[in-house]
UniProtKB/Swiss-Prot annotation:
It comes from Streptococcus thermophilus (strain ATCC BAA-250 / LMG 18311). Signal peptide: none annotated. GO terms for biological process: translation. This is Large ribosomal subunit protein bL34. Disulfide bonds: none annotated. GO terms for molecular function: structural constituent of ribosome.
């Protein structure tokens, strides 16, 4: 059986990257929450 996680850098960036987060209101909310929490890495 094939595993479900088949890593792809492009797909990862397009779905979870910083620019994608910035492109929506809720995405910006996610970044703000991660900044507030003090995360070292904000997005994939």
């Amino acid at each position: 059986m094939k595993r479900t996680y088949q890593p792809s850098k492009i797909r990862r960036q397009r779905k979870h990257g910083f620019r994608h987060r910035m492109s929506t209101k809720n995405g910006r909310r996610v970044l703000a929450a991660r900044r507030r929490k003090g995360r070292k890495v904000l997005a994939a």
